[in-house]
From Swiss-Prot:
This is Sodium/potassium-transporting ATPase subunit beta-1-interacting protein 4. Keywords: Cell membrane, Membrane, Transmembrane, Transmembrane helix. Belongs to the NKAIN family. It is found in: Cell membrane. It comes from Xenopus tropicalis (Western clawed frog). One of its GO terms (cellular component) is plasma membrane. Its main location: membrane.
Amino acid sequence: MACCTGRCTLILLCTLQLVAALERQVFDFLGYQWAPILANFLHIVATILGLFGTLQYRPRYVIAYALWAAVWVTWNVFLICFYLEVGDLNKESELLTFHVSQHQSWWSEHGPGCVRKEAPVAGVAELESHSYVSVIGCNVEYQYIEVMHSALQILLALLGFVYACYVTSVFTEEEDSFDFIGGFDPFPLYHVNEKSNHLLFKQSYLPA
């Protein structure tokens, strides 16, 4: 297929998804966000699988990628609800760290314009190095940065899902048409040649 088709568009989308996922994975590692780290890892694996399937004309791999894209959209919708505190969700909770640490998003202290100040906690020994961290002057609150990340992931995943379905249908049609004309199966050609030779042999022995 030419590069202007849905196949090459899906390759481009998978590449963009890999770049966006790797960028997000770095900042989630910096913020010790273990649930997003695990989800990002699975997303990277599924995207590589979809990219391989698209390059190698493997519709089953592309279908697996499309199914994951639906799961990925659901996960990012949950993240948007989490950071916007929809319902009983609380962005200050330890849900995304599996309750093993009190870390928040890396952007909560390192966002655009944020100034991080530390003050020692009164009554705590200096050797324990406990301090109170305050962040002021942020141009954009960290939850909105996370929401924008998730919105971008949703957009790419939806486009990827649509093109994955299209590419899968194209691959399937090509396989069906290829099988119809014989494909790599040598039997039809061999069978025709054998039948022709048999007829010629029979005609040569007909009485004059």
